[in-house]
Amino acid sequence: MKTNFLVKPLGLLVALVLGISSCKPPKPVPESEYAAKIVGNWLGEVGHMNESMTLNGDGSFIARLRPRGFISNTLSQGATGTIRGMWTINGKTITLRITSAEDEHVKDRVTSSTILAFNQDELSLKSDHDETSTFSRTLSP
């Protein structure tokens, strides 16, 4: 009986310690690893658009933009625009060179953003137009 009395609190203590240790914030990606670790699928909001972005290991990217709002979200009336191009990272700056755009008006063919924060699952960027956007890593585009 006494052993059982001690096992339960000990088990709860172990569960509590494991739970607290798993609540640590994710470690930031070192700047020297940005180009390798940024490869993958990302989802975020840019202005009034939902944006999914795939950054490939060969330096190519594809971004899909869809307007947000009642009509777009409920009746699927919003057209999804697609932008393709190449990306590079130099220090904390990611540069996108656009090679094609479908159903999307592109002002500039080259744009750069500063990486404000980057961990395994989240990426915060500040555009050269001074807008901040946060993207979350996803499993699929």
Labelled PLM ranges:
Residues 1-21:
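Sec-dependent bacterial lipoprotein signal peptides
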Residues 23-141:
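Lipid interaction determinants
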